[in-house]
């Protein structure tokens, strides 16, 4: 819909009348409208949703993508996400040589599902990034990597679980402090 807030907001970005766009709307719709209005960068075949999450390293945060745009990915999508995430970390988060990790169920090179096992050696040979290997879920919030890449299925689960745990801990602390 041409008069929807998403369409209007993204058109303002395209016309350089706005620097960015935030929405509380459906992420799938936001992606679709973004692709139609803004298009994709050269070499990018799939957009990704990224988010900044807190961690215990000296920076206090890391960037994770994809957290929900693409539930099924091919290895080249993950490589593109790694390059985009690294560029974002450099330009926006001001990290000179951001480390890039691949979300997996173990830190060893041979761990993971078929996608993870297939993309690992490709990321290892990608000169455009500082690949540091697999990052396990238990290590995410330690900040072992400045950028963590995965498909949108795994990323969305990791994001939603972390949000749920944060809400749970907050409610328990609030209950204990107020009782």
Where are these predicted regions, by residue range?
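Glycine-rich phosphate/diphosphate-binding loop of Rossmann-like nucleotide-binding domains
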Residues: 71-137, 146, 151
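Short glycine-rich anion-binding loops that position phosphate/pyrophosphate groups of nucleotides
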Residues: 26-29, 36, 107-108, 153-156
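Short acidic, glycine/serine/threonine-rich loops at helix termini
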Residues: 32-37, 76-77, 112-116, 159-162
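Structural motif
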Residues: 4, 11, 18-21, 28-29, ...
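N-terminal glycine-rich phosphate/adenylate-binding segment common to multiple enzyme folds
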Residues: 1-48
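Glycine-rich phosphate/nucleotide-binding loop
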Residues: 35-60, 64, 144-179
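A generic local secondary-structure boundary/capping motif
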Residues: 11, 38, 50-55, 69, ...
